[in-house]
Amino acid sequence: MTLQTEYEFTLPKGYIDSQGNLHRDGRMRLATAADEILPLRDPRVKSNPAYLTVIVLSRVVTQLGGLGELNPNIVEGLFVEDLAHLQQLYRRINGEDGQAEVQTASGLGE
């Protein structure tokens, strides 16, 4: 039996980059303890605890369309529906009792 550590997803709307390209398909990996602990040291999280979601997702989303490495600026640029979709996926694959305050939007399905 093997442990699945990466999960594919398709964003409902998709991220539009600076050239106007749409990126919808991606991959998310299971979170590690470091993914939830290290962002707590980030000054952006200290001044705005809600920013934890942005940092954590930028660490665990390993691919989004043809983009290179994902960073917090890309996560900030997601449509709200897409952010909620990723939060829901994060909670589903990592269990409901994770430490990161990644919340789902009610009523959104995957």
Locations of regions flagged by a protein language model:
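Short, surface-exposed, charged amphipathic helix/loop patches that serve as local interaction elements
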Residues: M1-E110
